[in-house]
C-alpha cells in the first residue's frame, strides 16, 4: 500500500476482518476502507484503525463504509463509489470456530455451501459495477474458488492456508540450518486439508467421522542456499509440532497472510508468495504476485496439471469427493452419511442452482443442534 492513491476495501468486520484491518493499518498506503453491515461497528473499527495508522505510519486515510453483503446491488454501488484497487472479503455465513460442538464431527468441507454464497454475491456485484480490482476471498478459498470458476465467478485469489504452511517451513528450516529466511526457498503445493497436520491448532477441522487413511497428498520442495533438502526431511518438518494459539487468535496469522497478499497485489515488482485458489484452481500453490496479476511459480519438476491433481485429491480429506467443471460438487460418501446422522439431512451432490437453498437449510439445522 505504498502508493498514496491506492484504495483497499475490506468487506466484513467480524473477528478476522477486524484483524485484517488492523494489520493493514500498520503499513504506509493510501486509503483503507472498513465495511460492515452495522454502521456503528464499521465506524468503531475504522476509527481505531485510523489511530493505529497515525501512530505507526499506516495508510493516509482510514474510513468506514456500510454494506449488506447479501445484496449485490448495494455492494456494486459501494464499488462504483470507492473504485478500490484491491477488495478483501473476510465474511462468511459460518465461522469455523463457531460450529456447534455436536456438528464438529463433520469435516470443514461439509459447510461449503455456506461459504459460497457471499463470495458469489461479491463477484456478481463486481461484474455489475465493472470494477477491475482483484478480489482476495478468505472463506474456504481452496474449494470456493473452483466451485465458482465454473460460472466465471472465481475470485483472483484467496489468502492464508498454504502461505501459513509455507511460512512455517521457511521459519523452521532457517532456524535449523542457521541461515536467514532469504536463504530458504520453499515451494509448496498443498490443500487447506493439509493445514491440520501442519498445525495441531486446526486439528478439529477434519471432524472425526471417518475419512481417508493417512495424510492428504502434497508436493513440497525446499532448498537452502541452493541445496535441495531431502523430501522425507521436508515432510517431517512440515508435520512437526509447532506452537500456535488456539481458536480465533489464529486469525492474526491469517490476517498477516492476507496483508502480504494485498501488498503483493499492489506492488509493481512481482513478489514470491503462496496463495490458495489462484484463478479458481483447487488448493494452494507457489506464485508470483504483482499489480499485473498472479502467475504460478511451481517447482521445476512439476507441471500445472499435476499440481492441480494433487490438490483435487487432497480435497477428499476435507470431505469433498470432487468439484465438477460447472461448479457442482460431490461430497464424499462418509460426509453424506455423517450429515444424515448429525443434522438429519442427506446431501450427496450440490448443483450450482441449489447451493443457496442448501446453505439456508444447513444454517437452520445448525441453529437447532
Where are these regions (language model features)?
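Glycine-rich Rossmann-fold phosphate-binding loop(s) that bind the pyrophosphate
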Residues: 13-14
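N-terminal Rossmann-fold NAD(P) dinucleotide-binding loop
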Residues: 17-18
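Glycine-rich phosphate-binding loop and adjoining beta1-alpha1-beta2 segment
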Residues: 31-59
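Rossmann-fold cofactor-recognition segment
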Residues: 53-71
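Conserved Rossmann-fold cofactor-binding substructure of NAD(P)-dependent oxidoreductases
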Residues: 67-82
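NAD(P)-cofactor binding segment of oxidoreductase domains
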Residues: 104-130
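Rossmann-like dinucleotide-binding core of oxidoreductases
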Residues: 121-127, 131-219
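Long, compositionally biased stretches enriched for glycine and/or charged residues
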Residues: 178-369
Amino acid at each position: 500500500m505504498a502508493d498514496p492513491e491506492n484504495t483497499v476495501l475490506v468487506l466484513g468486520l467480524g473477528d478476522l476482518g477486524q484483524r485484517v484491518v488492523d494489520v493493514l493499518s500498520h503499513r504506509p498506503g493510501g486509503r483503507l476502507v472498513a465495511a460492515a453491515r452495522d454502521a456503528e461497528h464499521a465506524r468503531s473499527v475504522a476509527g481505531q484503525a485510523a489511530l493505529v495508522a497515525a501512530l505507526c505510519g499506516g495508510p493516509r486515510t482510514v474510513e468506514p463504509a456500510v454494506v449488506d453483503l447479501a445484496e449485490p446491488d448495494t455492494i456494486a454501488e459501494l464499488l462504483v463509489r470507492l473504485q478500490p484497487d484491491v477488495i478483501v472479503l473476510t465474511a462468511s455465513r459460518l465461522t469455523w470456530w463457531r460450529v456447534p460442538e455436536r456438528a464438529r464431527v463433520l469435516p470443514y468441507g461439509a459447510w461449503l455451501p455456506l461459504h459460497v454464497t457471499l463470495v458469489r454475491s461479491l463477484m456478481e456485484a463486481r461484474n455489475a459495477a465493472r470494477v477491475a480490482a482483484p478480489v482476495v476471498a478468505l472463506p474456504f478459498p481452496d474449494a470456493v474458488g473452483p466451485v465458482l470458476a465454473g460460472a466465471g465467478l472465481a475470485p483472483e485469489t484467496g489468502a492464508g492456508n498454504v502461505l501459513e504452511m509455507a511460512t512455517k517451513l521457511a521459519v523452521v528450516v532457517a532456524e535449523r540450518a542457521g541461515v536467514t529466511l532469504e536463504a530458504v526457498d520453499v515451494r509448496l503445493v498443498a490443500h487447506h486439508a493439509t493445514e491440520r497436520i501442519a498445525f495441531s491448532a486446526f486439528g478439529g477441522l477434519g471432524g472425526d467421522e471417518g475419512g481417508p487413511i493417512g495424510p492428504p497428498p502434497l508436493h513440497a520442495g525446499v532448498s537452502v542456499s541452493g541445496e535441495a533438502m531431502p523430501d522425507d526431511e521436508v515432510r517431517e518438518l512440515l508435520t512437526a509440532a509447532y506452537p500456535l494459539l488456539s481458536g480465533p487468535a489464529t486469525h492474526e496469522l491469517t490476517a498477516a497472510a492476507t496483508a502480504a497478499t494485498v501488498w503483493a497485489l499492489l506492488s509493481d515488482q512481482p513478489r514470491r508468495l503462496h496463495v490458495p485458489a489462484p484463478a479458481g484452481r483447487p488448493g494452494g500453490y507457489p506464485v508470483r504476485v504483482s499489480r499485473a496479476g498472479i502467475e504460478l511459480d511451481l517447482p521445476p519438476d512439476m507441471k500445472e496439471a499435476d499440481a492441480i491433481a494433487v490438490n483435487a485429491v487432497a480435497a477428499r480429506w476435507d470431505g469433498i469427493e470432487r468439484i465438477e467443471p460447472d461448479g457442482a460438487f460431490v461430497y464424499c460418501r462418509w460426509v453424506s452419511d455423517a450429515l444424515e446422522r448429525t443434522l438429519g439431512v442427506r446431501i450427496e451432490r450440490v448443483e450450482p442452482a441449489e447451493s443457496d437453498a442448501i446453505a439456508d437449510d444447513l444454517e437452520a439445522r445448525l441453529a437447532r443442534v
